[in-house]
């Protein structure tokens, strides 16, 4: 019988002294499950900075939030319900901290609606939305809230999940790649990670009629206040905990370049990209809801027909093929075994399910352009984008 190599898992049982940090990391990574960190009361249009900084005493994989509350709509139905209501009640989330190598950074600055949609871009199951005890369908095409489901006169007990992954999202078979993006205690200055939430109001859900009233109370109650439950998920890495070269993922959601969607045209530059290692570029298009409170920004509709032949460009050359957005959109969906929701368009560079293939935007020369160009098909469109970037050298990739 031939001599077969001992599987890595069996070698670890006997001790990890002879293994490299990469071998250990590939074998030892067990998540501890969501651990309660903080409970934040909801107040309309408030933007609280959580009084406690995130406890980073173990490698951290994700932050999970749940908005739990009752919304009572009375007087009159909403005349228009926003496409992504009610997850628009959390307007924005900012995560910032001081990294020992990259100094003060903001890894997350995204709208609540985009955070809600994010997992669905990369896996079959997205964030959970439960209305009056009924799990809602996954985001699909189109994305449009039905007023009879939410927006008409009625009482709605809402449980809305917002999972914020700290690593790029890979398929289950490639989950160990997440280890190279965990927030390691030794990489950050003390307990400097700070979370800020930005809350909406009744205009976050759409356009209320003149007689519409909206009351926010505790989940399952006509009194009290809604709450945001915030949990953290840590990983146990064993001997690998202090040996991994961890990268930091940056996701900042921005509006398209001013005026770029105001006129119909071909090959229009709609956004400049940062010259950083890039794992994904996600676009979101539709129309903006008018008449909201000053600090509230909401998509009235999500629409795939605002842009066409969208390209990631370096020096006038596309870095990924795309002749029709519907083909590019469904290619990304096939690669991640999901349905890309209406209005969203993802250009992945890690459909290989490994960070080894991220686009080396950091190697684009100083005088070169790194941008998003597109044909613009309508003069009334609105859009945002997220360039998912990587700082550092995960896996010692250089």
Locate the predicted segments by residue:
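Beta-strand-centric surfaces of beta-sandwich/beta-rich domains
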Residues: 1-398
